[in-house]
């Protein structure tokens, strides 16, 4: 399979900060998935690093567009750290376009992207990359174990979806953007790209174990299809 993994920055770079052993744990899982015969591409979010730089930028009077650029640079730093851990399985350059990522993939290596354009989340980048390279599966690794109707970290009665359509995902993202206190695992732009491209998506808890499970066809999360 050709698989795009979308890793939230908070998954790879948690609040307590980056740890080399944790990064290597993820790298080893991706190496294993590739060794099993899959083609692997990765998009990494900015996490704590991006949030801190964006906050400082705003305090210093930077425009939102400039803060977006700070966030993009942070995602690329995270991508470069993962590339370093991947060693010969990747190329020591963060691709900044889908064409470049596909070229690396076609060379038998693992491309690791960060952000690309101001205003676009790395979720949207991952969905666009999956569409561009005609991926068989987009895996979204988050800090929760699937898509819920509201934030399960805040609401005990949050309902998890085992399966849903892309249109249902879009509707949920719209609803979440309008309701105070609500949040969607997948943002609206990414959801619309998923719907447009008719992508098959698995939303799972972004642990190394669950990412490996997905490559084996075991999805302990939400499947989005159709």
UniProtKB/Swiss-Prot annotation:
Q: Where in the cell is it found?
A: Cytoplasm
GO BP annotations of the record are: 'de novo' CTP biosynthetic process; UDP biosynthetic process
Cite the EC number. 2.7.4.22
Task: Note the superkingdom of the native organism.
Answer: Archaea
The positions annotated for binding ATP are: 9-10, 47, 51, 142-143, 148, 151
Keyword NAD carried by entry: no
InterPro entries named among the record's database cross-references: AceGlu_kinase-like_sf, Asp/Glu/Uridylate_kinase, Glu/AcGlu_kinase, Uridylate_kinase, Uridylate_kinase_arch/spir
In terms of one coarse class, where is the protein primarily found? Answer: cytoplasm
Q: Which Pfam families match?
A: AA_kinase
Q: Summarize where UMP binds, as residue positions.
A: 46, 68, 116-122
- Purpose: Catalyzes the reversible phosphorylation of UMP to UDP.
Q: Which HAMAP family does the annotation name?
A: PyrH_A (MF_01220_A)
What is annotated about its quaternary structure and interactions? Homohexamer.
Its protein name is: Uridylate kinase
